[in-house]
Amino acid sequence: MSPTMFTIISILLSLICLVVGYFVRKTIAEAKISGARNMAEQIVEDAKRDAEALKKEALLEAKDEIHSFRVEAEQEVRERRNELQRQENRLLQKEENLDRKDESLDKRESLLEKRDHSLNERQQHIEEMESKVDDMIRLQKAELERISSLTRDEAKQIILDQVENELSHDIAVMTKESENRAKEEADKKAKNILSLALQRCAADHVAETTVSVVNLPNDEMKGRIIGREGRNIRTLETLTGIDLIIDDTPEAVILSGFDPIRRETARIALDKLVQDGRIHPARIEEMVEKSRREVDDYIREMGEQTTFEVGVHGLHPDLIKILGRLKFRTSYGQNVLKHSIEVAHLAGLMASELGEDAKLAKRAGLLHDIGKAIDHEVEGSHVEIGVELATKYKEHPVVINSIASHHGDQEPTSIIAVLVAAADALSAARPGARSETLENYIRRLEKLEDISESYEGVEKSFAIQAGREVRIMVKPDSINDLEAHRLARDIRKRIEDELDYPGHIKVTVIRETRAVEYAK
């Protein structure tokens, strides 16, 4: 290639490069200008948004300040209003105090006037009495002049007779008032002692029944208990003296008998036989004998546990065992051992309040029904049997007298005997302590109402509170107030003579007179 051509080509390439560079530079410049323009617009937009945000923030701050100012203003107004209300209340209070003081001054002035009037009347009365005394002195002088011819002893006797006649009525009135005050104080103190004792003593009672239930693993066991031709059940009934009732009750056998110790022996023996699975006459005899020993041990443990619980020590071992037998005795559904424990606690608490020997009172209370443990085995009442047992085991004379007198068979010779009788009545008569059969209960209620309605003038009677109170409505035109009291006493006496009941029965006679008119 010639140099000239090379030069031309170089020039052309340079020109092309210049043109291309120009256009490239122009394009870059335009792009930068466009980017700068966009950036400027973005900055403007951002500035506008920031300005708008600042504006809103300023408005919110202004609103918050306005709200805060308003709240503070309302609070201040409220406080001022409350302060004004308090000032008004204080003024009203002062005004009321002034009114009360004014009223008090008026009352005081009225009282002073009454006292002045009373003093004037008293002064007048004193003057009248002085006049009467002067008259009496003159009369006495005249009487002395009349009897001056008598001896000294005769004159003294005449004066004493006159004084006795004048003061006999006053002495009788004062004696009656003193007796009433003494009775009121004694009643108040007795109620206080009883309430304190009852509050500090709490005992639970379990109502016993005449049946026990033995659960079986399955009904097939019933056939094994009966045995071939009934020999097993006959053996068990013969050895324990308890009837076995096998009926449709699922998986259960009922033991029926009135001797709780025998029934418990049969229950334990039957439980052992069911668990062992071997049921035949020889095994039954073995289990019954073992159950008797267990029941005897349990009775002894119950006696020892009871003496420990009550805090009575030094009892004869045989007496402790007899005491444990009370666990299986009931009276009107009340467990006798629980009843004896409650009586012991009540008697001890009341003895402490009266300053008597609390331990001796507990001992007497615990043993007061000891005769019930064997009264079905020995002839005589439980009181007589209890006295014999206490005497046999050399108990304290106070304990023996407490047993003998707690039902009124003998006179109590000590305060402790009286406390035991009171504790026995409290434990037996409190609501829920004793129960009776439904038939006897209904019969007793009907008898109460029949006795009450048998008197002339009785309109209707109601036995309420489970038979512990009877209310008698009488005709007011047939019976007056005095006759109502006499009627209550007569009904009370008939109830005591004709009915047997635990605790006491309150007799209330209600006489009501109504006068009705209609305004038209």
Swiss-Prot record:
SMART domains according to UniProt: HDc, KH
PROSITE patterns in the record, alphabetically? HD (PS51831), KH_TYPE_1 (PS50084)
Q: Where is the KH domain?
A: 210-273
Q: Family per UniProt?
A: Belongs to the RNase Y family.
Domain HD, residue spans? 336-429
Write out the transmembrane intervals: 4-24
Protein name (database record): Ribonuclease Y
Localisation: Cell membrane
* A biological process from GO: mRNA catabolic process
Q: What is its main location?
A: membrane
